[in-house]
Regions:
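Class I SAM-dependent methyltransferase SAM/SAH-binding core
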Residues: 51-101, 111
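Core SAM-dependent methyltransferase catalytic element
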Residues: 192-195, 263-272
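Conserved catalytic/acceptor-binding region of the Class I
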Residues: 105, 138, 142-223, 233
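C-terminal helical/coil "lid" or tail adjacent to the Rossmann-like core of SAM-dependent
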Residues: 14-16, 197-258
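A short glycine-rich, Lys/Arg-flanked "PGG" loop and its adjoining helix->strand segment in the class I
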Residues: 127-139
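Conserved alpha-helix/loop element of class I SAM-dependent methyltransferases that forms part
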Residues: 26-50, 61, 65
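A short SAM/SAH-binding and catalytic strip from SAM-dependent methyltransferases
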Residues: 110-125
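N-terminal, positively charged/glycine-rich alpha-helical extensions of SAM-dependent methyltransferases
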Residues: 1-34
Length: 272
């Protein structure tokens, strides 16, 4: 339920979060939590790529780190808005709408990466989006998808209420409200003709009980729901005061109930 990059444009306003400078900080916190939980920036067995594409690059942090790992490669970050300042020399940012098709020819990219766009890409578009990712991938190259569930577990009262508000908002906007994207990542890849597909589920802790990862994830979700308060108010008639109280109660629940949030990582290889 945690929105990543590829934020809303004038044409596509389905992304649930409004634009705001603090979103840069939140997305970076999210990145650090995921990197630590996975133990790496990716799980696919990528070796010395010459061209890497990060779709929905957000702040660019993931791509910046790939630039450092593969200094001989060009890393391209695609998003509706520009990356943060300080990009490495081998980074190139492209502003484009994923839903209008990727602005690349067939078979160009060694490694295609896309993360946390289920709160930006309509459910009905997912199969076509993954097919387009496979199209631009070079034969023998790798595609990796990372997406989150639409629920927090256990769904304690305040936590469950916040998650339900998020799902209602997503449903209104044609986004995933049932976890179908989370559960279908490997199938999307297989149906796009990708082979050697693997899927890994990871349960991330929320709260200080979960150490550094839990602390980062709690900060991410606290910022997420705080940012969503005016959106909930406008779309669902929920007062800012109720949202504030729900967030406060939810933070207590995370520590008491050892709440977790699951992500799925699926990757595969484009056949030669």
């Amino acid at each position: 339920m945690d929105g990543g990059g590829d934020r809303a444009s004038d044409r596509d306003v389905s992304y649930v979060l409004p634009r705001h400078p603090t979103e840069v900080d939140r997305l970076d916190v999210q990145h650090y939590a995921l990197r630590e939980a996975l133990g790496a920036n990716y799980l696919a067995p990528v070796q010395r790529p010459t061209l890497v594409l990060d779709v929905g690059a957000g702040t660019g942090q993931w791509a910046f780190e790939l630039c450092a790992e593969f200094p001989e490669a060009q890393v391209v970050g695609l998003d509706l808005e520009p990356s943060k300042p300080g990009a490495p020399a081998n980074y190139r940012g492209i502003r484009a709408n994923l839903l209008e098709g990727l602005p690349f020819g067939d078979g160009q990219i060694n490694f295609v990466h896309q993360r946390l766009l289920f709160s930006g890409v309509p459910v009905k578009a997912w199969a076509a989006v993954v097919t387009d990712l496979a199209r631009v991938c070079r034969p023998g190259g790798w595609i990796e998808l990372v997406e989150g569930d639409t629920e927090l577990r256990p769904a304690s009262p305040a936590t469950g209420r916040l998650a339900e508000l998020f799902r209602r908002l997503s449903r209104i906007r044609g986004l995933d409200s049932t976890g179908i994207v989370f559960s279908s990542l490997d199938r999307y890849l297989t149906r796009a003709g990708v082979t050697a597909v693997e899927r890994h589920n990871v349960a991330l802790p929320l709260g200080e009980w979960g150490g550094r990862i839990g602390s980062l994830m709690a900060s991410d979700f606290r910022a997420l729901f705080t940012r969503l308060a005016p959106v909930f108010a406008a779309a669902l008639g929920v007062s800012a005061e109720e949202c504030e109280e729900l967030v406060r109660e939810a933070r207590e629940e995370w520590e008491r109930d050892h709440t977790t949030y699951s992500i799925a990582v699926a990757f595969g290889q484009k056949p030669n």
